[in-house]
Amino acid sequence: MKIFKGSATFSGIAVGRILYYHREISQVRQCFVSNVKKETADFEKARQKVAEELQILYGEESQIKRRQTALLEKGSFVRAVKSMIETEKVSAAYAVATTRDELSQTFRNLEEPAVKERIEDVRELSERLIAVLGGLSSTIFLGEKPVILAAETLSPGEILEMEKEKLLAVVTHQGSEISHASIMAKTIGIPALVDVEIEEDWDGLLAVVDGYTGTLYLNPDGELLKKYEERLKAEQEEKEELLKLKNKEAVTLDGHRISLYANIANLDDLNSVLFYGAEGIGLLRSEFQYLGRENYPRENELFRAYKKVAETMDKRLAVIRTVDLGADKQAAYMDIPEETNPIMGNRGIRLCLDRKRMFKAQLRAIYRASAYGNLAVMYPMISSLEELDEIEKITAQVKAGLREKGIAYKDIPVSVMIETPAAVMMSREIAQRVDFLSLGTNDLAQYTLAMDRQNPLLKEKYNDHNPAILKMIQMVIAEAHEEKKKVFICGELAADTELTETFLRMGVDGLSVVPACILPVRKAVRKSRREKE
């Protein structure tokens, strides 16, 4: 038996045979053509065909579909392909392959992680175009029995084109928790590991994937295999029991009800919010609209996304957090100056107040969309009342502009993310100025502990259960309640069922977690008491 450690991007257990998947990057021979007009027309037909494939594969509202469609319809990719066909008189397939390689190299040279993810978009789109131009199929066949798929890297399209019932788990070398493939694996609900050194001769070997510990067991011995088969059976039974809670309220044993909301990072997660029975969206991270692109999103693009959220949620609350860029989320086109310590630098609301044109465009989009549902707006990384003063001034300007143009909007609830020690100490004063508070425990923990949560050297020392953090949470809840304002927790700690009863006894009004954690947290609430016996 061999043991390999990776990083788990979605929990769960899988037992089965490995299918090693090797992606073939199309190598197209240089081929000159005499009829440039026909070759250009063939490229246009291929674009139309691929657009139809993307629609069927991803659906209308998928962010991946939108990004690839944007590449397909306009921008440097299409211009480069057409220019190469016309000036060098080469085949459309060769022009696509060459442009793919050049654009991918450009992205590799960038330091922004989110832009590097676009390499997958370019590669997948190019492979589809080349397949259509060559009359080939892009479907991936897994065989007769369900498998654990092992690959160097995977695109979301490759996962979607596989039969979901044939996928037990996904293990890759490249990727991250926020990579396209990891998100897609989470969406279809299968365990996923990244950062595992994959070898081709694993094909056909028996394996166990532990998505809780990030471990892959190759050729497990009988004792380990029996242990995991029993755990897998228990896990499946647990899932069936949890699904029975979908339409149940989150009420404690002593009759106290709290709200359970979902955290989502893009529009692809909207269906999961409804499927798992969340009461709404407690945190919509809006960074997905700003990362992985070449320029600022237009106001109408933002508006359409928020309108979709409002309409999908209908009467359910949906809290949109204004863009939280900086630190580990950089957008190259913004030309943010390099900082010695970006985690402590110009990020979140600080960057928004520096880039007022960007900030106002997002606020206009949010308020315009508010007419279509039950929205709220939330501001990240607040550390002073002066920031609230400036936000209120800008918001008043935005509302006045909408009124002048006769554009409908609602006076929606306003919230602040309490995620800095400064905000904790000023939580009473902040609560006096907003409608409710949300505790962002991820950043609050790292700022309180003075530890970068992504620093591997501090992994063993980083403890977000530290009593200092719990005392801060309790303080915020007490201070806000003195002002008759509700408090929600929307960081990773909200999904930690070991702390559910602790938070309930502190008096928290609601928890907001990733959709897949809604049911486990609901179960934990229903087994807890708010008052001590």
Model-assigned labels for residue ranges:
Residues M1-G135:
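Conserved, well-structured core domains of diverse proteins
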Residues M1-R23, V28, A131-G134, F141-F275:
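Acidic, glycine-rich flexible loop/linker segments
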Residues L71, A93, I119, V170, ...:
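Conserved phosphate/pyrophosphate-binding and hydrolysis machinery centered on Walker-type P-loop NTPases
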Residues N109-T139, S384-P413:
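Amphipathic alpha-helical
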Residues E127, I183, R304-K307:
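Residues on a specific face of well-ordered alpha-helices
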Residues K239-E533:
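Conserved alpha/beta-domain cores
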